[in-house]
Every structure is written in structure tokens, then in C-alpha cells.
């Protein structure tokens, strides 16, 4: 029984890690979805700013009574852009937190594995059970998952 303890310790930390990874993946996906309309908004604002710069407001008779209209419009567009950028900055912070949360859980799994590696039976590590994949496969998956998040936002 004592020889099973190292394997059980690694399996337990794996069992705790995967639900966290799944929850963080959901947060990652929803955050990325939140970014799409913000990026569209920024793109539209950039087009509007460019179009407004190409118009000579003083040459349009209907706009002459509003001498500061071009500057007010520009200011409003820039303010709207700043708001969208602030929201995107918040989303980026969320993505970085997801990356860090996943990495810390993966690191914990590998620390536990390394802590018990000398006592682990290699056959047991490589052997899947009826209800779960092998520990080696799960460790490889976690490395791939961690690499994905780290390469997305280094």
C-alpha cells in the first residue's frame, strides 16, 4: 500500500487540476468572445476618424455654424476609442490571469510528480486504467495546455 502512495498523490493532484483547467478554458473562451465587438468598434472608430480628417468642414455650408464641430467630433471619437482600449486592457488582464492560473496548477502537478518520481513505478505511470488515461498521457496533455496558453500570451 505504501508503494501506491506516490502514484495516488500524483493522481490526486491531476484529478484536482483538470477541472480548474476546464473552468479556466471557459473563461478564456468567453473573454476572447468579448474582445471581438471591442475590436470591431475600434476598427469602426479608426475609419470614422480617418473619414472626418478627409472632410473640410468649413467647405460644407450646413456645418459652418458649428466652427468647433470637427474638433468636438474628433474628441468624442478618441474618447470612445479610449473606452474600448480600456475594456480590451481589462480583457487582456483576464487572459493573463487565466494563463497564470493554469500554469500554476500545471506546475503544482509537475512538482508533485518530481517529488515522488523516484518512488513511482514506470509501468504504473504508463498504464491507463479503465476509468482514466495513463498518468504519462495526462502529464503530456498538461504540458501541451500550458504551452498553448504561454505561447498565446508570452
What are these regions (language model features)?
Residues 1-154:
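Long alpha-helical rod scaffolds of large eukaryotic non-enzymatic complex subunits
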Amino acid at each position: 500500500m505504501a508503494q501506491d502512495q506516490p502514484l495516488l498523490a500524483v493522481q490526486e493532484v491531476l484529478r484536482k487540476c483538470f477541472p480548474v483547467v476546464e473552468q479556466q478554458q471557459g473563461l478564456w473562451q468567453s473573454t476572447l468572445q468579448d474582445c471581438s465587438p471591442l475590436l470591431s468598434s475600434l476598427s469602426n472608430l479608426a475609419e470614422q476618424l480617418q473619414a472626418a480628417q478627409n472632410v473640410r468642414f468649413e467647405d460644407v455650408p450646413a456645418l459652418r455654424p458649428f466652427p468647433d464641430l470637427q474638433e468636438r467630433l474628433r474628441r468624442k471619437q478618441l474618447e470612445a476609442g479610449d473606452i474600448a482600449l480600456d475594456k480590451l486592457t481589462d480583457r487582456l488582464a483576464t487572459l493573463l490571469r487565466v494563463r497564470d492560473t493554469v500554469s500554476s496548477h500545471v506546475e503544482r502537478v509537475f512538482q508533485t510528480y518530481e517529488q515522488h518520481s523516484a518512488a513511482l513505478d514506470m509501468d504504473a505511470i504508463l498504464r491507463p486504467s479503465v476509468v482514466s488515461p495513463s498518468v504519462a498521457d495526462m502529464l503530456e496533455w498538461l504540458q501541451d495546455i500550458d504551452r498553448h496558453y504561454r505561447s498565446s500570451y508570452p
